[in-house]
From Swiss-Prot:
The modification Phosphoserine is found at S9. F-actin-capping proteins bind in a Ca(2+)-independent manner to the fast growing ends of actin filaments (barbed end) thereby blocking the exchange of subunits at these ends. Unlike other capping proteins (such as gelsolin and severin), these proteins do not sever actin filaments. InterPro entries: CapZ_alpha (IPR002189), CapZ_alpha/beta (IPR037282), CapZ_alpha/beta_2 (IPR042276), CapZ_alpha_1 (IPR042489), F-actin_cap_asu_CS (IPR017865). It comes from the Eukaryota. The keyword Acetylation applies. Transmembrane segments: none annotated. One of its GO terms (cellular component) is F-actin capping protein complex. GO terms for biological process: actin cytoskeleton organization; barbed-end actin filament capping. Pfam families: F-actin_cap_A. This is F-actin-capping protein subunit alpha-2. Gene3D superfamilies: F-actin capping protein, alpha subunit, F-actin capping protein, beta subunit. The keyword Phosphoprotein applies. Keywords: Acetylation, Actin capping, Actin-binding, Phosphoprotein.
Length: 286
């Protein structure tokens, strides 16, 4: 280990540490951070050199955060990043500071939204919240309305997780949907992501994503929001069903092929009658 320390520069150590942190499984950021901290053995170097990794992890994972004084959680995403550690809560029209290491929101202040697209954003958010409440018991969603390349754009983000450390597994669902508000029809683009980590007597990760494209009829705000939710629901249901079916197929075929069905003797042991076996008698006489 001493030779390795001599070979690696501080910059290289931080680069490796940052990679570990960015790729931490959902719900296991603190565990990975603490392990990396012990390995690096230099808190100042870790905090200063890997700060970007803390931020990138939260942005990638759509980390939900509760703001004191407000009922609903908001997601930390690149779409709400205002710079200098500040983020947007479009529903409550506030901005706030976010500590990427502690995952805490502070200093909420009023923030003026894009008025030209706000009515569309609100309609989509209302419909999406109802959808998320029905399909994701622990789900959180945030909807942004902004101008991108001069076009009014709606961006909808969904996050839902189950952290079961006592049962040795953690998992997170993320989806992101975008469409521009254009007359008659527009293109909806989405990406769905699933990440699950199971680590009891082993270490298995499921990391999957799917890109979606569909056309959306644009009319008034409320009707367009309803049609948008139909697209989201159909795509996410289809993806989740496909994942479940593939997982069952793997369980029935691939995983079974990895283990021996019977001992080398091709005979199952009846443990209730172990004393009747020769080995049992030998153990009894020993």
């Amino acid at each position: 280990m001493a030779d390795l320390d001599e070979q690696l520069s501080d910059e290289e150590k931080v680069r490796i540490a940052a990679k570990f942190i960015i790729h931490a499984p959902p719900g296991e950021f603190n565990e990975v951070f603490n392990d990396v901290r012990l390995l690096l053995n230099n808190d100042n170097l870790l905090r200063e050199g890997a700060a970007h990794a803390f931020a990138q992890y939260n942005l990638d994972q759509f980390t939900p955060v509760k703001i004191e004084g407000y009922e609903d959680q908001v997601l930390i995403t690149e779409h709400g990043d205002l710079g200098n550690g500040k983020f947007l809560d479009p529903k409550n029209r506030i901005c706030f500071k976010f500590d990427h290491l502690r995952k805490e929101a502070t200093d909420p202040r009023p923030y003026e939204a894009e008025n030209a697209v706000e009515s569309w954003r609100t309609s989509v958010e209302t419909a999406l919240r109802a959808y998320v409440k029905e399909h994701y018991p622990n789900g959180v969603c945030t909807v942004y309305g902004k101008k991108i390349d001069g076009q009014q754009t709606i961006i909808a983000c969904i996050e839902s997780h189950q952290f079961q450390a006592k049962n040795f597994w953690n998992g997170r669902w993320r989806s992101e949907w975008k469409f521009t508000i254009t007359p008659s029809t527009t293109q909806v683009v989405g990406i769905l992501k699933i990440q699950v980590h199971y680590y009891e007597d082993g270490n298995v990760q499921l990391v999957s994503h799917k890109d979606i494209q569909d056309s959306l009829t644009v009319s008034n705000e409320v009707q367009t929001a309803k049609e948008f939710i139909k697209i989201v629901e159909a795509a996410e249901n289809e993806y989740q069903t496909a994942i479940s079916e593939n997982y069952q197929t793997m369980s029935d075929t691939t995983f079974k092929a990895l283990r021996r069905q019977l001992p080398v003797t091709r005979t199952k042991i009846d443990w209730n009658k172990i004393l009747s076996y020769k080995i049992g008698k030998e153990m009894q006489n020993a």
